[in-house]
C-alpha cells in the first residue's frame, strides 16, 4: 500500500477489488451458490476465489469472509511476533497458528464475530520466557487485532527446536 508520514505517524493505504463471477448455467452448482461466488483481486497478487460460508449457501472450496477475517488476525499476529523476535535477536523460529472464531447470528440475520482464539505453537531454541514475552508484545502490536471490537485471545505454546515433535 501507499504511505505518507505526518508528525512521525505513518499512514498506509491498501486497496483491492471484489468482483462477482458470472453464473454459468452449465455447472452442477446451484445458481444460488454461484451467485455468491466472487474474486478478490489486487495488484501483483493471484486472485482469491471467494464465496459465502457453506452454512450461508456458499461453497466450502472457496474462502469466505469469516475465514479471511480469522486469517488476517492469525497472519498479523505471526508477522508481529516475527518482527519482535527478529528485533530482539532471536534466531531461527518456526511458528504455526491454529485459529478459531465464534460468529453469533441474531434472529434478524445480523451477526458479529464475538471472539477469536489464536493458538500459536512456536518452535525455537530461544528460552520460553523470551518467546512468551514476544507473543504478548505481538498481541499489542498487531494492526488487525487493534482494529477489531471482538476479544482476541492468544494462548502460545513453545517447543524446543531441537526436541522431538511432542507438544508441551
Kindly label every feature range from the protein language model.
Residues 3-71, 79-168:
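Extended beta-strand/beta-hairpin segments
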